[in-house]
């Protein structure tokens, strides 16, 4: 049995350096699928520590295919796995925030546990997800937003894919995705499926150089800022850590309806996003997009607080900027020069 697996089975937690070595072994293909499944199961059962998470993140970031970072870009990648089957809120928020002037490096993947992953819905919207590190950077520079399709940037993840799929439950990799943006962004909005996990991720992030990160977990179970219940937030900014909660009413929004933001496929998700940008969607869908885009605008440094960011996002949707931004994102690179 793998020595790290044996240690965890015996109740030990791993130091950061040990966690790094374990992740290297998984990423190198040096562990069997049963060993990988075993370690993921043990960690999920007892709960990961911030030290372990930080060690895993260091390796994931170091091995990511990247051409270097860009200043002041923001990511809206969340953990997923909330089981509520909403449309792709973080993707709609990313497009809206980029329409309002934020530089967005959206990290994401196809669906694993949800009805629609960010890559799935972007394809349905007509946005290319097959991008190299260089073309992502050019897209951010030219269009304010680029999409980093996780399998293209984290090729070593192929060694754990089978074990993850076979396990079928949330593992540490749900937490690692948002923490492993290949451009190593320092500004993020991270939706988390539980507030305990948000606290864990915040503690791990404090071991890295971050400028402004919001981790959000709603009390209705959403891994987003919600319009149907209060949302608990951890904010990391300038070396400080704040915890607080917000409610939809603080932003002038009436309590929304979950059924208005739920979908059964990536096609439905894409259609709802198009309707939001065309000002034809239910108010719940509009408001939840504005709220989450507002958080991205705020963490990008373009608003003084979440309320101002949300107001800016709402205007970007209502005045057609978000719809026009989606059309820009659909353009191929050569068409931008035509």
From Swiss-Prot:
Q: Which InterPro entries match?
A: Anthranilate_Pribosyl_Tfrase, Glycosyl_Trfase_fam3, Glycosyl_Trfase_fam3_N_dom, Glycosyl_Trfase_fam3_N_dom_sf, Nuc_phospho_transferase
Q: Does the keyword Magnesium apply?
A: yes
Q: Where along the chain is anthranilate 2 bound?
A: 164
Metabolic or biological pathway:
Amino-acid biosynthesis; L-tryptophan biosynthesis; L-tryptophan from chorismate: step 2/5
Recorded catalytic reaction(s): these are:
N-(5-phospho-beta-D-ribosyl)anthranilate + diphosphate = 5-phospho-alpha-D-ribose 1-diphosphate + anthranilate
A Pfam family hit:
Glycos_trans_3N
Sites where the protein binds Mg(2+) 2: 223-224
| Alphabetical UniProt keywords | Amino-acid biosynthesis, Aromatic amino acid biosynthesis, Glycosyltransferase, Magnesium, Metal-binding, Transferase, Tryptophan biosynthesis
Q: Which positions form S-S bridges?
A: none
GO BP annotations of the record are:
L-tryptophan biosynthetic process
**Cofactor binding note of this UniProt entry:** Binds 2 magnesium ions per monomer.
Give the EC number: 2.4.2.18
Residues that coordinate or bind anthranilate 1: 78, 109
Please give the superkingdom of this protein's source: Bacteria
Required co-factors: Mg(2+)
- Binding of Mg(2+) 1, residues: 90, 224
One GO MF term on file is: anthranilate phosphoribosyltransferase activity
The positions annotated for binding 5-phospho-alpha-D-ribose 1-diphosphate are 78, 81-82, 86, 88-91, 106-114, 118
In the record, the note on similarity to other proteins reads: Belongs to the anthranilate phosphoribosyltransferase family.
What does the record give as the function of this protein? Answer: Catalyzes the transfer of the phosphoribosyl group of 5-phosphorylribose-1-pyrophosphate (PRPP) to anthranilate to yield N-(5'-phosphoribosyl)-anthranilate (PRA).
Q: What is known about its subunit structure?
A: Homodimer.
Protein name according to UniProt: Anthranilate phosphoribosyltransferase
């Amino acid at each position: 049995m793998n020595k790290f697996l044996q240690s965890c089975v015996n109740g030990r937690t791993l130091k950061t350096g040990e966690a790094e070595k374990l992740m290297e072994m998984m990423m190198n293909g040096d562990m069997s699928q049963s060993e990988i499944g075993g370690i993921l199961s043990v960690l999920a059962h007892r709960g990961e520590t911030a030290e372990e998470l930080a060690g895993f993140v260091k390796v994931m970031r170091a091995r990511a295919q990247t051409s270097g970072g860009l200043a002041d870009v923001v990511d809206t990648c969340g953990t997923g796995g909330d089981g509520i089957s909403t449309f792709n809120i973080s993707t709609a928020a990313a497009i809206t925030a980029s329409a309002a002037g934020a530089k967005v490096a959206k990290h994401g993947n196809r669906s694993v546990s949800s009805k629609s992953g960010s890559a799935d819905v972007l394809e349905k919207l007509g946005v290319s997800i097959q991008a190299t590190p260089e073309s992502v950077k050019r897209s951010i520079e030219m269009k304010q937003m680029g999409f980093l399709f996780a399998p293209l940037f984290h090729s070593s993840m192929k060694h754990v894919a089978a074990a993850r799929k076979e396990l079928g439950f949330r593992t540490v990799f749900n937490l690692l995705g948002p923490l492993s943006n290949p451009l190593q962004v320092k500004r993020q909005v991270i939706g988390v499926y539980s507030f305990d996990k948000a606290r864990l991720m915040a503690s791990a992030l404090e071991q890295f150089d971050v400028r402004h990160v919001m981790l959000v977990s709603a009390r209705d179970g959403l891994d987003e800022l919600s319009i149907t219940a209060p949302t608990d937030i951890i904010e990391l900014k300038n070396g400080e850590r704040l915890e607080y909660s917000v409610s939809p009413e603080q932003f002038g929004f009436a309590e929304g309806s979950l059924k208005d933001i739920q979908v059964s496929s990536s096609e439905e998700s894409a259609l709802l996003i198009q309707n939001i940008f065309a000002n034809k969607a239910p108010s719940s869908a509009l408001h939840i997009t504005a709220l989450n885009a507002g958080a991205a605008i705020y963490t990008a440094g373009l608003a003084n607080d979440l309320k101002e960011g949300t107001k800016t996002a709402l205007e970007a949707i209502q005045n057609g900027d978000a719809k026009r931004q989606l059309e820009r994102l659909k353009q191929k690179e050569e068409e931008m020069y035509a």
